[in-house]
Design a protein with these regions (language model features):
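Boundary/entry segment of secreted carbohydrate-active catalytic domains
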Residues: 104-145, 150
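Hydrophobic single-pass membrane-insertion segments
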Residues: 29-47
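Aromatic-rich peripheral "rim/lid" segments of glycoside hydrolase catalytic domains that contact
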Residues: 3-5, 19, 23, 222, ...
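Noncatalytic carbohydrate-binding groove/subsite architecture in carbohydrate-active enzymes
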Residues: 113-117, 209, 213, 248-402
């Protein structure tokens, strides 16, 4: 009190008491205001509730992804007799082998998707193709906001529950530094999870589909808040990716999709769940040793069956692929287009929707609409191959000889614009940036699609994508 008296020299007795009383009132009122400001509702303070910071995560593939589908230029090998091997029936306890990214993202979540009307993306191999920081810088220079990284699960979990995350973590950091959004595409279960094998060992789901949900959950837990989309499998209408005793099976795939969707959304509702993109096959083929076993199925038929089984309720976006063969993107399969100089004659001598980028993607959309849904497409792989300037070309990819580098550039850009204008495509990923750098040579089916040549120099499509408008 003595301090107050010294600061109030000259006041009379009554005035002093009044001043003291007034001071006490101000102290009490100020304290109440301070308390309410800290603890009161955010909306009353004119502030937004805290939101998580949106960052980026990625993973990559130790091996390559198919650059084209069998119905578009390659033959699908027949399966042979199966050999049974024991398979663990329990979901393994996850074990972290390397890295600590999960701890850094422990409490964050991805902001709910939906504000972006169209996402421009590209597939990148950020582990096997060199320094991920360099490649993410190239994506940024292209002006693209999304990267696709395929995860061949079998390459990273040799032992149940033990995943080597080191390559994943490096790519996550590189993408985060560039502010890129990431779509994981997960495919190919480890051999220990599957009982069916044959002489032509290929990708397959696990016997216990719960293992897929477990792996998806571990991905989200580790990179929570930095994964923006996950594609659940890849080209599951081919036994190349669904090599099981029963063969291609839409029922089992949709069950896998439901389990994966639940595992992902329960951890991070903001992640875009994409159904596995189908391969445009142009027909159906059965195993010559087992006529009841389908080794590939027409994509329109498979899509219709997925829809009947409720797949649209287990995804945010319907995955789609089309690698454009030697037809321009705006040409329908049945309009009589012909290129008399073409070496690869499939689209001209045997017309079918599967040859046409336009007809295939519009056909998917029409089937979704017919089911009463407005679910968008996510085109997780598209592009045109050109072998111009290469010393060779992949077997079965004669169409890559028909497309010049200038046509590749023109058609890649045109396809992006068409998908943007359609309004029913949410994300589109060009195939691919840098698979030419994996060291597999001109017979690699992925290399003719790449924007980077074998010598590391940009091909014309690189500059065309960089310079195209991206509204």
């Amino acid at each position: 009190m003595s301090g107050f008296a010294r600061r109030s020299r000259g006041l009379g007795g009554n005035q002093l008491y009044v001043a003291i009383a007034a001071w006490l009132v101000l102290v009490i009122v100020g304290g109440l205001c301070t308390w309410y400001g800290w603890l009161g509702p955010a909306s009353d303070r004119g502030e937004e509730s805290p939101k998580s910071v949106e960052t980026v995560a990625e993973a990559d593939v130790a091996g390559g992804e198919p650059g084209g589908s069998e119905g578009q230029g390659g033959g699908e090998p027949a399966a042979t007799d199966a050999v049974g091997t024991p398979v663990p029936s329990m979901v393994p306890d996850p074990t972290v082998v390397q890295g600590s990214a999960a701890e850094e993202a422990e409490s964050s979540t991805t902001e709910p998707p939906g504000q972006e009307t169209f996402g421009y993306g590209i597939a990148v191999n950020g582990v096997g193709g060199g320094d991920p920081a360099y490649w993410m810088g190239q994506v940024e220079s292209l002006g693209l906001g999304w990267v696709k990284q395929q995860i061949r699960w079998a390459h990273f979990e040799d032992t149940p529950g033990e995943v080597d995350w080191s390559g994943f973590d490096a790519v996550v950091g590189a993408a985060s530094d560039r502010g890129l959004k990431v779509m994981f595409s997960v495919v190919d279960a480890p051999e220990w999870s599957r009982s069916y094998t044959d002489q032509n060992v290929e990708g397959a789901p696990p016997d216990n589909l719960g293992l897929v949900a477990d792996f998806m959950g571990r991905l989200v837990d580790r990179y929570k808040g930095r994964i923006h989309a996950i594609e659940v499998w890849n080209e599951q209408n081919l036994d190349r990716e669904w090599d099981t005793a029963e063969g291609v099976d839409a029922e089992r795939y949709v069950e896998m999709l439901r389990l994966a969707h639940q595992a992902i959304k329960s951890r991070d509702p903001g992640i875009i769940v994409i159904s596995g993109a189908l391969s445009p096959t142009g027909g159906q083929q059965t195993d010559p040793n087992n006529p009841d076993r389908i080794i590939w199925m027409d994509d329109f038929d498979y899509m219709a069956r997925m829809i009947e089984l409720g797949a649209l309720d287990a995804c945010d976006c319907v995955g789609a692929h089309h690698n454009g063969i030697n037809l321009p993107p705006n040409v329908a399969w049945d309009e009589g287009y012909n290129d008399p100089t073409a070496q690869f004659r499939g689209p001209f001598d045997n017309p079918h929707h599967s040859w046409s980028f336009l007809s295939t993607l519009q056909g998917y959309h029409e089937r979704i609409q017919a089911a009463g849904s407005d679910k968008p497409l996510c085109v997780t792989e598209f592009g045109w191959a050109s072998a111009e300037g290469f010393d060779g070309y992949p077997p079965g990819f004669e169409f890559a000889l028909d497309n010049t580098l200038e046509e590749q550039a023109q058609w890649d850009v045109q396809a992006f614009g068409m998908m943007r204008d359609w309004g029913f495509v949410r994300l589109a990923f060009l195939w691919n940036l840098n698979y030419s750098q994996l060291g597999w040579g001109p017979e690699d089916p992925n290399a003719p699609y790449a924007l980077i040549g074998f010598n590391g120099a940009a091909r014309p499509a690189f500059e065309a994508i960089r310079d195209m408008p991206k509204p």
